[in-house]
Regions:
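Broad hydrophobic/π-residue packing in well-ordered secondary structure
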Residues: 10-15, 35, 68-73
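Intrinsically disordered, low-complexity boundary segments flanking structured domains
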Residues: 1-2, 22-25, 66-68
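Short, charged/polar N-terminal "headpieces" of proteins
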Residues: 1-19
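C-terminal structural segments of small proteins and small subunits
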Residues: 54-83
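A short, structured beta-strand/loop element
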Residues: 15-50
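N-terminus-biased detector of the onset of the functional/mature region
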Residues: 1, 38-51, 65, 79-83
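Short, functionally important structural connectors and interaction interfaces within domains
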Residues: 2, 35, 40, 59, ...
Length: 83
């Protein structure tokens, strides 16, 4: 699963092979793993601590267009971390 970015111990990845809708990203934080919808950055599966969920959403919302483009074209592009 290609890594897009990482920040505060959270790794953001996108998986292109055999993916299924809705378009989403994977967030991994320690032993926790969750899927977030690219459209609205809502957690659609998995579990993350509440603080990590907020950080993923804060990071992902400004990059929704870039993430959707990656999903559509299956071309990975590294994105800057949350600061």
């Amino acid at each position: 699963m290609p890594e897009i970015t990482r920040f505060y111990g959270i790794v953001i990845k996108i998986f292109f092979q055999n993916e299924h809708n809705p378009p989403h990203i994977h967030a991994i934080y320690g032993e926790h793993n969750a899927l977030f919808s690219i459209k609205d950055m809502q957690m659609i599966e998995g579990d993350l601590p509440a603080r990590a969920v907020k950080l993923v959403q804060e990071w992902g919302r400004p990059f929704a267009k870039e993430l959707q483009q990656m999903w559509d074209t299956k071309e990975l592009k590294k994105l800057p971390p949350l600061k």
